[in-house]
Amino acid sequence: MSGLKIALPAPCAFILSRLHENGFEAYAVGGCVRDSLLHKTPHDWDITTAAKPKKIIELFSDIPVLETGLKHGTVTLLIDHEPYEVTTFRVDGDYTDGRHPDSVAFTTDIRDDLARRDLTINAMAYSPATGIIDPFGGQEDLNNEIIRCVGDPHKRFSEDALRLMRTIRFAAVLGFTVEPETLRAVHDLHETIGRVAKERIFTELLKAVCAPYAAEALRAAPELLFCAVPQLKNLKGVPQNSKYHIYDVWEHTLHALESIGTDDPIACLAILFHDVGKKAVRTTGEDGYDHFFGHAEKSAAFTDEALRTLHCDNKTRENVAELVLLHDTAFPKRTAKFRRLLAKLGYEQFYRLLAVSRADSLAHAPWCIEDRCKALADAKSEAESLQKADFCLSLRQLKITGKDLQAFGFQGKAIGETLNKLLDAVLCGQLPNDREVLLLHLERYTQKHK
Protein backbone atom coordinates (compact mmCIF):
# COMPACT_ATOMS: atom_id res chain seq x y z
CA MET A 1 0.00 0.00 0.00
CA SER A 2 1.04 3.59 -0.58
CA GLY A 3 0.13 6.81 1.17
CA LEU A 4 -0.08 8.73 -2.10
CA LYS A 5 -3.39 10.48 -2.67
CA ILE A 6 -5.18 10.62 -6.01
CA ALA A 7 -7.81 13.25 -6.74
CA LEU A 8 -10.89 11.31 -7.81
CA PRO A 9 -13.65 12.88 -9.92
CA ALA A 10 -16.86 13.31 -7.91
CA PRO A 11 -18.81 10.48 -9.63
CA CYS A 12 -15.95 8.04 -9.07
CA ALA A 13 -15.63 9.04 -5.41
CA PHE A 14 -19.41 8.65 -5.04
CA ILE A 15 -19.37 5.10 -6.47
CA LEU A 16 -16.47 4.02 -4.23
CA SER A 17 -18.12 5.59 -1.20
CA ARG A 18 -21.48 3.88 -1.71
CA LEU A 19 -19.84 0.49 -2.21
CA HIS A 20 -17.67 0.96 0.90
CA GLU A 21 -20.66 2.08 2.98
CA ASN A 22 -22.38 -1.16 2.07
CA GLY A 23 -19.43 -3.31 3.10
CA PHE A 24 -17.72 -3.91 -0.24
CA GLU A 25 -14.12 -3.17 -1.16
CA ALA A 26 -13.92 -0.94 -4.22
CA TYR A 27 -11.07 0.75 -6.08
CA ALA A 28 -10.25 2.87 -9.07
CA VAL A 29 -8.10 0.55 -11.15
CA GLY A 30 -5.82 0.31 -14.15
CA GLY A 31 -5.10 3.15 -16.54
CA CYS A 32 -6.68 5.88 -14.42
CA VAL A 33 -4.30 5.08 -11.56
CA ARG A 34 -1.32 4.94 -13.92
CA ASP A 35 -2.19 8.25 -15.56
CA SER A 36 -2.84 9.94 -12.22
CA LEU A 37 0.60 8.92 -10.97
CA LEU A 38 2.08 10.32 -14.19
CA HIS A 39 0.19 13.59 -13.58
CA LYS A 40 -1.88 13.02 -16.71
CA THR A 41 -5.65 13.44 -16.91
CA PRO A 42 -7.25 9.98 -17.20
CA HIS A 43 -9.62 9.41 -20.11
CA ASP A 44 -11.69 6.87 -18.19
CA TRP A 45 -12.17 5.91 -14.58
CA ASP A 46 -12.70 2.17 -14.20
CA ILE A 47 -13.76 0.71 -10.89
CA THR A 48 -13.35 -2.78 -9.50
CA THR A 49 -15.17 -4.14 -6.46
CA ALA A 50 -15.86 -7.22 -4.38
CA ALA A 51 -19.60 -6.72 -4.97
CA LYS A 52 -21.23 -9.08 -7.48
CA PRO A 53 -22.97 -7.57 -10.53
CA LYS A 54 -26.50 -8.12 -9.21
CA LYS A 55 -25.52 -6.43 -5.95
CA ILE A 56 -24.02 -3.48 -7.85
CA ILE A 57 -27.27 -3.05 -9.77
CA GLU A 58 -29.24 -3.24 -6.52
CA LEU A 59 -27.05 -0.69 -4.74
CA PHE A 60 -27.30 1.77 -7.64
CA SER A 61 -30.96 1.28 -8.48
CA ASP A 62 -31.40 5.06 -8.49
CA ILE A 63 -28.90 5.45 -11.37
CA PRO A 64 -29.24 4.42 -15.04
CA VAL A 65 -27.42 1.12 -15.55
CA LEU A 66 -26.18 -0.64 -18.69
CA GLU A 67 -25.89 -4.42 -18.28
CA THR A 68 -24.02 -5.13 -21.51
CA GLY A 69 -20.90 -6.49 -19.77
CA LEU A 70 -22.54 -8.83 -17.28
CA LYS A 71 -20.90 -11.90 -18.88
CA HIS A 72 -17.54 -10.63 -17.61
CA GLY A 73 -18.87 -9.10 -14.41
CA THR A 74 -19.13 -5.51 -15.67
CA VAL A 75 -21.93 -3.07 -14.96
CA THR A 76 -21.86 0.42 -16.49
CA LEU A 77 -23.28 3.26 -14.41
CA LEU A 78 -24.35 6.45 -16.18
CA ILE A 79 -23.72 9.52 -14.04
CA ASP A 80 -24.24 12.93 -15.64
CA HIS A 81 -24.38 11.08 -18.98
CA GLU A 82 -20.84 9.76 -18.46
CA PRO A 83 -20.22 5.97 -18.29
CA TYR A 84 -18.37 4.42 -15.35
CA GLU A 85 -17.57 0.73 -15.63
CA VAL A 86 -17.79 -1.20 -12.36
CA THR A 87 -16.40 -4.74 -12.55
CA THR A 88 -16.39 -7.45 -9.92
CA PHE A 89 -12.97 -8.76 -8.80
CA ARG A 90 -12.31 -11.72 -11.09
CA VAL A 91 -9.82 -14.28 -12.28
CA ASP A 92 -9.77 -15.41 -15.89
CA GLY A 93 -10.01 -18.98 -17.13
CA ASP A 94 -8.07 -20.40 -20.07
CA TYR A 95 -7.66 -18.37 -23.27
CA THR A 96 -8.33 -21.03 -25.91
CA ASP A 97 -8.57 -18.53 -28.77
CA GLY A 98 -5.56 -16.50 -27.65
CA ARG A 99 -7.74 -13.42 -27.24
CA HIS A 100 -10.55 -13.89 -24.73
CA PRO A 101 -10.96 -15.91 -21.53
CA ASP A 102 -13.19 -18.97 -21.92
CA SER A 103 -14.67 -18.17 -18.54
CA VAL A 104 -14.31 -15.81 -15.60
CA ALA A 105 -14.67 -16.54 -11.91
CA PHE A 106 -15.36 -13.94 -9.26
CA THR A 107 -12.96 -13.53 -6.36
CA THR A 108 -12.88 -11.49 -3.17
CA ASP A 109 -9.17 -10.57 -3.35
CA ILE A 110 -8.13 -7.46 -5.26
CA ARG A 111 -4.65 -8.93 -5.73
CA ASP A 112 -6.08 -11.86 -7.68
CA ASP A 113 -7.81 -9.37 -9.96
CA LEU A 114 -4.66 -7.32 -10.48
CA ALA A 115 -2.65 -10.46 -11.25
CA ARG A 116 -4.62 -11.09 -14.48
CA ARG A 117 -3.70 -7.70 -16.00
CA ASP A 118 -1.15 -7.18 -18.75
CA LEU A 119 1.47 -4.74 -17.49
CA THR A 120 2.66 -3.79 -14.02
CA ILE A 121 1.91 -0.12 -14.67
CA ASN A 122 -1.70 -1.10 -15.37
CA ALA A 123 -1.99 -3.42 -12.37
CA MET A 124 -2.52 -0.88 -9.59
CA ALA A 125 -5.65 0.01 -7.66
CA TYR A 126 -6.57 2.97 -5.45
CA SER A 127 -9.14 3.99 -2.92
CA PRO A 128 -9.00 6.84 -0.38
CA ALA A 129 -9.37 4.25 2.38
CA THR A 130 -6.34 2.13 1.41
CA GLY A 131 -4.18 4.31 -0.78
CA ILE A 132 -2.47 2.61 -3.73
CA ILE A 133 -2.41 -1.18 -3.88
CA ASP A 134 0.56 -2.22 -6.01
CA PRO A 135 1.55 -5.88 -5.58
CA PHE A 136 3.62 -6.09 -8.79
CA GLY A 137 5.84 -3.02 -8.57
CA GLY A 138 3.96 -0.77 -10.97
CA GLN A 139 5.04 2.42 -9.19
CA GLU A 140 8.69 1.42 -9.32
CA ASP A 141 8.40 0.63 -13.02
CA LEU A 142 6.73 4.00 -13.61
CA ASN A 143 9.56 5.74 -11.78
CA ASN A 144 12.17 3.77 -13.75
CA GLU A 145 10.27 4.19 -17.04
CA ILE A 146 9.97 0.46 -17.62
CA ILE A 147 7.30 -1.54 -19.49
CA ARG A 148 7.04 -4.96 -17.84
CA CYS A 149 4.46 -7.72 -17.96
CA VAL A 150 2.73 -8.94 -14.81
CA GLY A 151 4.29 -12.34 -14.14
CA ASP A 152 5.50 -14.48 -17.05
CA PRO A 153 5.37 -12.37 -20.25
CA HIS A 154 5.07 -15.44 -22.49
CA LYS A 155 1.97 -16.46 -20.54
CA ARG A 156 0.50 -12.94 -20.61
CA PHE A 157 0.95 -12.61 -24.38
CA SER A 158 -0.24 -16.16 -25.06
CA GLU A 159 -3.46 -15.34 -23.24
CA ASP A 160 -4.21 -12.33 -25.43
CA ALA A 161 -2.11 -11.49 -28.49
CA LEU A 162 -3.44 -7.92 -28.57
CA ARG A 163 -1.23 -7.30 -25.54
CA LEU A 164 1.76 -7.44 -27.90
CA MET A 165 0.56 -4.32 -29.68
CA ARG A 166 -0.50 -2.68 -26.42
CA THR A 167 3.01 -3.14 -25.05
CA ILE A 168 4.57 -1.35 -28.01
CA ARG A 169 1.86 1.30 -27.92
CA PHE A 170 2.58 2.12 -24.27
CA ALA A 171 6.30 2.33 -25.06
CA ALA A 172 5.47 4.74 -27.90
CA VAL A 173 3.17 6.89 -25.79
CA LEU A 174 5.25 7.03 -22.62
CA GLY A 175 8.77 6.75 -24.00
CA PHE A 176 9.48 3.86 -21.62
CA THR A 177 11.85 0.96 -22.29
CA VAL A 178 10.39 -2.52 -22.69
CA GLU A 179 12.35 -4.66 -20.22
CA PRO A 180 14.35 -7.54 -21.77
CA GLU A 181 12.16 -10.52 -20.79
CA THR A 182 9.01 -8.77 -21.96
CA LEU A 183 10.66 -7.70 -25.23
CA ARG A 184 11.98 -11.24 -25.77
CA ALA A 185 8.43 -12.55 -25.43
CA VAL A 186 7.23 -9.97 -27.98
CA HIS A 187 9.85 -11.28 -30.43
CA ASP A 188 9.06 -14.93 -29.68
CA LEU A 189 5.30 -14.57 -30.05
CA HIS A 190 4.99 -11.85 -32.70
CA GLU A 191 3.33 -14.20 -35.20
CA THR A 192 0.37 -14.72 -32.86
CA ILE A 193 -0.77 -11.18 -33.70
CA GLY A 194 -2.60 -12.90 -36.57
CA ARG A 195 -5.24 -13.99 -34.05
CA VAL A 196 -6.27 -10.40 -33.49
CA ALA A 197 -9.04 -8.71 -35.49
CA LYS A 198 -7.65 -6.25 -38.04
CA GLU A 199 -9.73 -3.41 -36.59
CA ARG A 200 -8.09 -3.87 -33.18
CA ILE A 201 -4.63 -3.98 -34.76
CA PHE A 202 -5.37 -0.73 -36.58
CA THR A 203 -6.57 0.96 -33.39
CA GLU A 204 -3.35 0.09 -31.57
CA LEU A 205 -1.17 0.92 -34.58
CA LEU A 206 -2.77 4.34 -34.89
CA LYS A 207 -2.23 5.12 -31.20
CA ALA A 208 1.39 4.02 -31.47
CA VAL A 209 2.32 5.79 -34.70
CA CYS A 210 0.82 9.10 -33.49
CA ALA A 211 2.66 8.95 -30.17
CA PRO A 212 5.75 11.03 -29.29
CA TYR A 213 8.11 8.04 -29.10
CA ALA A 214 6.70 6.04 -32.02
CA ALA A 215 10.02 5.54 -33.81
CA GLU A 216 11.82 4.16 -30.76
CA ALA A 217 9.00 1.76 -29.99
CA LEU A 218 8.68 0.46 -33.55
CA ARG A 219 12.45 0.12 -33.84
CA ALA A 220 12.38 -2.20 -30.82
CA ALA A 221 9.90 -4.65 -32.37
CA PRO A 222 9.94 -4.49 -36.18
CA GLU A 223 8.91 -8.15 -36.58
CA LEU A 224 5.66 -7.47 -34.75
CA LEU A 225 4.89 -4.46 -36.96
CA PHE A 226 5.66 -6.35 -40.16
CA CYS A 227 3.53 -9.30 -39.09
CA ALA A 228 0.65 -7.03 -38.09
CA VAL A 229 0.84 -5.09 -41.39
CA PRO A 230 2.57 -7.31 -44.00
CA GLN A 231 2.94 -4.49 -46.56
CA LEU A 232 5.35 -2.78 -44.17
CA LYS A 233 7.83 -5.66 -44.57
CA ASN A 234 8.82 -3.88 -47.78
CA LEU A 235 10.56 -1.23 -45.66
CA LYS A 236 13.12 -3.68 -44.28
CA GLY A 237 16.47 -4.41 -45.88
CA VAL A 238 16.28 -1.84 -48.68
CA PRO A 239 19.53 0.13 -49.12
CA GLN A 240 19.51 3.64 -50.58
CA ASN A 241 22.87 4.09 -52.25
CA SER A 242 22.38 7.70 -53.20
CA LYS A 243 23.91 11.07 -52.42
CA TYR A 244 20.50 12.12 -51.11
CA HIS A 245 20.33 9.44 -48.40
CA ILE A 246 22.35 8.21 -45.44
CA TYR A 247 19.88 5.58 -44.13
CA ASP A 248 18.25 2.49 -45.57
CA VAL A 249 14.50 2.76 -46.17
CA TRP A 250 13.50 1.42 -42.73
CA GLU A 251 15.77 3.76 -40.78
CA HIS A 252 14.84 6.64 -43.06
CA THR A 253 11.17 5.98 -42.27
CA LEU A 254 11.81 5.91 -38.52
CA HIS A 255 13.86 9.13 -38.64
CA ALA A 256 11.09 10.78 -40.65
CA LEU A 257 8.55 9.60 -38.07
CA GLU A 258 10.69 11.20 -35.35
CA SER A 259 10.53 14.48 -37.28
CA ILE A 260 6.84 14.57 -38.17
CA GLY A 261 6.08 17.14 -35.45
CA THR A 262 2.35 16.41 -35.30
CA ASP A 263 0.01 13.79 -33.87
CA ASP A 264 -2.34 14.11 -36.83
CA PRO A 265 -3.17 10.46 -37.62
CA ILE A 266 -3.34 11.00 -41.39
CA ALA A 267 0.09 12.64 -41.53
CA CYS A 268 1.66 10.06 -39.20
CA LEU A 269 0.28 7.13 -41.19
CA ALA A 270 1.46 8.76 -44.40
CA ILE A 271 5.01 8.97 -43.07
CA LEU A 272 4.93 5.33 -41.98
CA PHE A 273 3.88 4.23 -45.48
CA HIS A 274 5.49 6.91 -47.68
CA ASP A 275 8.34 4.74 -48.99
CA VAL A 276 6.75 1.30 -48.71
CA GLY A 277 6.92 0.92 -52.51
CA LYS A 278 10.64 1.59 -52.91
CA LYS A 279 11.67 -2.05 -52.70
CA ALA A 280 9.41 -2.93 -55.63
CA VAL A 281 10.87 -0.30 -57.98
CA ARG A 282 14.52 -0.12 -56.89
CA THR A 283 17.11 -0.18 -59.66
CA THR A 284 20.85 0.45 -59.56
CA GLY A 285 22.51 2.49 -62.28
CA GLU A 286 25.92 1.94 -63.85
CA ASP A 287 27.27 4.57 -61.48
CA GLY A 288 26.29 2.42 -58.50
CA TYR A 289 23.54 4.77 -57.35
CA ASP A 290 20.09 3.42 -56.54
CA HIS A 291 17.00 4.84 -58.21
CA PHE A 292 13.36 4.52 -57.18
CA PHE A 293 11.40 5.76 -60.17
CA GLY A 294 7.66 5.57 -59.60
CA HIS A 295 8.02 4.74 -55.91
CA ALA A 296 5.37 7.25 -54.82
CA GLU A 297 2.71 5.62 -57.01
CA LYS A 298 3.72 2.14 -55.84
CA SER A 299 3.79 3.25 -52.21
CA ALA A 300 0.30 4.75 -52.53
CA ALA A 301 -1.02 1.47 -53.94
CA PHE A 302 0.51 -0.53 -51.07
CA THR A 303 -0.87 2.00 -48.59
CA ASP A 304 -4.38 1.69 -49.98
CA GLU A 305 -4.14 -2.11 -49.86
CA ALA A 306 -2.87 -2.15 -46.27
CA LEU A 307 -5.45 0.29 -44.94
CA ARG A 308 -8.28 -1.60 -46.64
CA THR A 309 -7.08 -4.80 -44.98
CA LEU A 310 -7.00 -3.02 -41.62
CA HIS A 311 -10.59 -1.81 -42.17
CA CYS A 312 -9.54 1.82 -41.96
CA ASP A 313 -12.37 4.23 -42.72
CA ASN A 314 -12.55 5.38 -46.33
CA LYS A 315 -11.83 9.07 -45.75
CA THR A 316 -8.69 8.41 -43.73
CA ARG A 317 -7.51 5.77 -46.20
CA GLU A 318 -7.99 8.08 -49.18
CA ASN A 319 -6.29 11.02 -47.47
CA VAL A 320 -3.30 8.93 -46.37
CA ALA A 321 -2.86 7.39 -49.82
CA GLU A 322 -3.07 10.86 -51.39
CA LEU A 323 -0.30 12.19 -49.14
CA VAL A 324 1.87 9.17 -49.92
CA LEU A 325 1.31 9.72 -53.64
CA LEU A 326 2.27 13.40 -53.37
CA HIS A 327 4.97 13.23 -50.67
CA ASP A 328 7.79 13.74 -53.18
CA THR A 329 6.09 16.73 -54.79
CA ALA A 330 8.28 19.64 -55.83
CA PHE A 331 6.01 22.50 -54.83
CA PRO A 332 5.36 24.63 -57.92
CA LYS A 333 6.81 28.12 -57.92
CA ARG A 334 4.41 29.35 -60.57
CA THR A 335 1.43 31.03 -58.90
CA ALA A 336 -1.23 29.29 -60.98
CA LYS A 337 0.12 25.76 -60.42
CA PHE A 338 0.62 26.39 -56.72
CA ARG A 339 -2.93 27.64 -56.24
CA ARG A 340 -4.37 24.76 -58.26
CA LEU A 341 -2.59 22.28 -56.01
CA LEU A 342 -3.82 24.12 -52.93
CA ALA A 343 -7.36 24.20 -54.34
CA LYS A 344 -7.24 20.47 -55.08
CA LEU A 345 -6.10 19.50 -51.59
CA GLY A 346 -7.69 22.15 -49.39
CA TYR A 347 -5.80 23.83 -46.58
CA GLU A 348 -5.96 20.99 -44.03
CA GLN A 349 -4.61 18.35 -46.41
CA PHE A 350 -2.08 20.79 -47.89
CA TYR A 351 -0.62 21.52 -44.45
CA ARG A 352 -0.46 17.78 -43.79
CA LEU A 353 1.45 17.35 -47.04
CA LEU A 354 3.91 20.04 -45.96
CA ALA A 355 4.42 18.26 -42.62
CA VAL A 356 4.98 14.92 -44.35
CA SER A 357 7.36 16.41 -46.92
CA ARG A 358 9.30 18.23 -44.22
CA ALA A 359 9.67 15.09 -42.09
CA ASP A 360 10.78 13.16 -45.17
CA SER A 361 13.31 15.89 -46.00
CA LEU A 362 14.75 15.97 -42.47
CA ALA A 363 15.56 12.26 -42.81
CA HIS A 364 17.66 12.82 -45.96
CA ALA A 365 21.39 13.47 -46.24
CA PRO A 366 22.35 16.62 -44.29
CA TRP A 367 23.62 18.56 -47.30
CA CYS A 368 20.21 18.70 -49.01
CA ILE A 369 17.98 19.34 -45.99
CA GLU A 370 18.25 23.14 -45.83
CA ASP A 371 17.13 23.83 -49.40
CA ARG A 372 14.26 21.35 -49.15
CA CYS A 373 13.00 22.81 -45.89
CA LYS A 374 13.27 26.39 -47.16
CA ALA A 375 11.08 25.55 -50.15
CA LEU A 376 8.52 23.98 -47.81
CA ALA A 377 8.60 26.97 -45.47
CA ASP A 378 8.00 29.29 -48.44
CA ALA A 379 5.07 27.15 -49.57
CA LYS A 380 3.58 27.22 -46.09
CA SER A 381 3.97 30.99 -45.87
CA GLU A 382 2.24 31.47 -49.22
CA ALA A 383 -0.63 29.16 -48.23
CA GLU A 384 -1.07 30.96 -44.92
CA SER A 385 -1.21 34.32 -46.71
CA LEU A 386 -3.90 33.05 -49.08
CA GLN A 387 -5.86 31.56 -46.20
CA LYS A 388 -5.66 34.77 -44.18
CA ALA A 389 -6.91 36.73 -47.19
CA ASP A 390 -9.71 34.18 -47.70
CA PHE A 391 -8.55 33.79 -51.28
CA CYS A 392 -11.05 31.97 -53.50
CA LEU A 393 -10.01 28.33 -53.93
CA SER A 394 -13.40 26.67 -54.33
CA LEU A 395 -16.75 27.07 -56.08
CA ARG A 396 -18.27 27.69 -52.67
CA GLN A 397 -16.18 30.87 -52.37
CA LEU A 398 -16.82 32.03 -55.93
CA LYS A 399 -18.95 35.18 -55.97
CA ILE A 400 -21.36 33.86 -58.60
CA THR A 401 -23.43 30.67 -58.63
CA GLY A 402 -25.21 28.32 -60.97
CA LYS A 403 -28.34 30.45 -60.72
CA ASP A 404 -26.43 33.38 -62.18
CA LEU A 405 -25.34 31.23 -65.11
CA GLN A 406 -28.90 30.05 -65.67
CA ALA A 407 -29.93 33.70 -66.01
CA PHE A 408 -27.45 33.95 -68.89
CA GLY A 409 -28.95 30.88 -70.56
CA PHE A 410 -26.49 28.20 -69.41
CA GLN A 411 -28.00 24.76 -68.83
CA GLY A 412 -27.00 21.27 -67.68
CA LYS A 413 -23.31 20.35 -67.76
CA ALA A 414 -22.42 23.75 -69.18
CA ILE A 415 -23.17 25.33 -65.80
CA GLY A 416 -20.60 23.27 -63.91
CA GLU A 417 -18.04 23.48 -66.71
CA THR A 418 -18.32 27.27 -66.90
CA LEU A 419 -18.15 27.72 -63.12
CA ASN A 420 -14.96 25.66 -63.02
CA LYS A 421 -13.44 27.72 -65.84
CA LEU A 422 -14.24 30.90 -63.94
CA LEU A 423 -12.74 29.45 -60.76
CA ASP A 424 -9.56 28.55 -62.62
CA ALA A 425 -9.38 32.08 -64.04
CA VAL A 426 -9.60 33.44 -60.49
CA LEU A 427 -6.95 30.97 -59.29
CA CYS A 428 -4.62 32.05 -62.09
CA GLY A 429 -5.16 35.73 -61.36
CA GLN A 430 -6.83 36.38 -64.72
CA LEU A 431 -10.03 37.54 -63.01
CA PRO A 432 -10.69 38.89 -59.52
CA ASN A 433 -13.27 37.14 -57.36
CA ASP A 434 -15.59 40.12 -57.70
CA ARG A 435 -19.26 39.52 -58.47
CA GLU A 436 -19.69 42.52 -60.78
CA VAL A 437 -16.53 41.72 -62.74
CA LEU A 438 -17.50 38.06 -63.10
CA LEU A 439 -21.02 38.94 -64.27
CA LEU A 440 -19.61 41.42 -66.80
CA HIS A 441 -17.22 38.72 -68.04
CA LEU A 442 -20.15 36.33 -68.46
CA GLU A 443 -22.18 38.92 -70.31
CA ARG A 444 -19.35 39.56 -72.78
CA TYR A 445 -18.77 35.82 -73.18
CA THR A 446 -22.42 35.10 -74.00
CA GLN A 447 -22.63 38.02 -76.44
CA LYS A 448 -19.49 36.82 -78.21
CA HIS A 449 -20.81 33.24 -78.52
CA LYS A 450 -24.41 33.98 -79.56
Predicted regions and their residues:
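Catalytic cores of the polymerase beta-like nucleotidyltransferase superfamily
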Residues: 1-450
